[in-house]
Amino acid sequence: SSSGNQAEAVSALTMLGYTQSEASVAVAKIDENLSVEEIIKQALKILSRQV
């Protein structure tokens, strides 16, 4: 499911060292119909801009 993709992306991002809340906020901004890989890529772009 699409929300499953988002959950998977959030968990991958937390494994990379982001907090659950940072990852959730970034993932929430991304189209949930994308693949897990695409969601992660776009979330990383969002998160890297915040630093």
Predicted regions and their residues:
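AAA+ ATPase "lid" subdomain C-terminal helix
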Residues: E32-L34
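Strongly charged, low-complexity linkers/loops
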Residues: S1-V27
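A general structural motif at alpha-helix termini
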Residues: V27-I30, A43
